[in-house]
């Protein structure tokens, strides 16, 4: 071997053993894959993906946010022989499937891309609604609305969120807030539309009309959402679940699990709370829309701030604020007080929901965005499954004060774990993290 050849080999060896960047840093999520993210984030292609993902959340989580209307209808007409707890399991299991299957859809997104998964999930969602429109028994409603529709959501929601994270690096939290705000808009529109339709047409045609509305919207999402060109020709990555050992990811998942145990209590019970005070039932119905309308801004504005001061910093602050507001729930006894509570809680809780994705994506390399979000959402699925029944069991003996304190305190406890995750990234209190 010549001297020049050996010298070249010696120069190449260190490069092959280069240590990868720390995935827990903010910068690593943008550069750890070895390629830079798009230089211009708000390109026509990126905006198209943003719009498609917005439509996904509007049709999926936004429709799920209207379950309170279904709960009331089932109790009064369709499933009057079933208890409130039995009916609430439909909504709880729907949330469990919606988040629980994301561990699978997240891995498949990283490996095969979002388009086929979103097309599959869209077909499952529409099929589930058509089957729901034909259902007359409790088990049929459970299989279609709770199980099948929830599984369909898991195959459209996470691929959309993970793909948006690939397009946006510096403005990731803002972008995520924009697409998640689609669920807030859906939470405003779907309850009003369903309530009107239930009063004017049959249950079957109400659900079928909802399916016909979703069909073109999800079709547009299937056409719009695709990975950046730089990922199109890359070899399919092997399964990499190393992020589950990351202490930051562990603290984040535990914290969000605790927060989500109490997060949706005001969404589900603010209407019945207002009616229990003797207020107008028609006005009480619109409180759910007030909470969702406020969360529309809560999912966008904090994301804009988080891109500048850090995702974990903002998530910790809004989690604490959500817990404090929830603890003050029963202090609102007038119509004006309940409206103010609904606005404040919607603003704070909306930020918690929109920042879970950016916080998860921040801890891993770009090729693992789907898996990381799937890990977090799997924890949320368990909270969604047991959270509503726990709330119902607390409400019976302890009333709305007990429900308020449980929701607020469990969210405050969850914020402690968010703080631990934040300090694991950077110990300084006044630094971006």
Curated annotation (Swiss-Prot):
GO molecular function: transmembrane transporter activity
Chief subcellular location: membrane
UniProt GO cellular component terms: plasma membrane
SUPFAM superfamilies: MFS general substrate transporter
Superkingdom in the source lineage: Eukaryota
Topology class, membrane: Multi-pass membrane protein
Name the record gives this protein: Agnestins efflux protein AgnL12
């Amino acid at each position: 071997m010549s001297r020049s050849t050996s010298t070249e080999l010696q120069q190449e060896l260190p490069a092959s053993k280069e240590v990868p960047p720390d995935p827990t840093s903010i910068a690593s999520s943008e550069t750890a894959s070895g390629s830079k993210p798009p230089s211009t984030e708000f390109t026509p292609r990126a905006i198209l993906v943003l719009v498609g993902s917005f439509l996904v959340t509007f049709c999926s989580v936004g429709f799920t946010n209207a379950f309170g209307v279904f709960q009331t209808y089932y109790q009064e007409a369709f499933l009057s022989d079933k208890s409130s707890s039995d009916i609430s399991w439909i909504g709880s299991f729907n949330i469990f499937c919606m988040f629980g299957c994301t561990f699978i859809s997240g891995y498949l997104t990283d490996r095969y891309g979002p388009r086929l998964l979103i097309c599959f999930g869209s077909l499952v969602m529409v099929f589930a609604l058509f089957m729901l429109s034909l259902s007359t028994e409790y088990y049929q409603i459970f299989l279609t609305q709770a199980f099948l529709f929830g599984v369909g959501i898991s195959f459209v929601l996470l691929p959309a969120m993970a793909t948006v994270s690939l397009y946006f690096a510096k403005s990731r939290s803002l972008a995520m807030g924009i697409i998640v705000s689609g669920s807030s808009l859906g939470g405003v529109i779907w309850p009003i539309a369903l309530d009107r339709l239930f009063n004017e047409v049959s249950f079957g045609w109400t659900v079928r009309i909802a399916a016909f509305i979703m069909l073109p919207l999800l079709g547009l999402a299937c056409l719009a959402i695709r990975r950046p060109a730089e990922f199109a020709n890359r070899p399919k990555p092997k399964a990499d679940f190393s992020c589950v050992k990351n202490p930051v990811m562990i603290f984040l998942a535990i914290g969000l699990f605790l927060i989500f145990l109490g997060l949706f209590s005001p969404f589900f019970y603010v209407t019945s709370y207002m009616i229990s005070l003797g207020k107008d039932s028609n006005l009480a119905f619109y409180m759910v829309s007030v909470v969702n309308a406020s969360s529309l801004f809560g999912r966008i504005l904090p994301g804009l701030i988080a891109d500048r001061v850090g995702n974990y910093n903002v998530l910790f602050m809004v989690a604490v604020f959500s817990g404090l507001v929830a603890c003050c729930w029963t202090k609102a006894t007038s119509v004006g007080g309940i409206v103010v509570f609904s606005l404040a809680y919607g603003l704070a809780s909306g930020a918690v929901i929109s920042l879970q994705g950016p916080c998860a994506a921040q801890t891993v390399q770009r090729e693992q965005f789907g898996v990381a979000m799937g890990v977090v959402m799997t924890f949320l699925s368990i909270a969604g499954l047991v959270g509503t029944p726990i709330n119902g069991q607390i409400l019976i003996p302890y009333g709305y004060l007990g429900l308020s304190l449980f929701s607020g305190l469990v969210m405050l406890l969850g914020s402690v774990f968010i703080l631990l995750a934040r300090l694991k990234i950077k110990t300084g209190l006044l630094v971006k993290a």
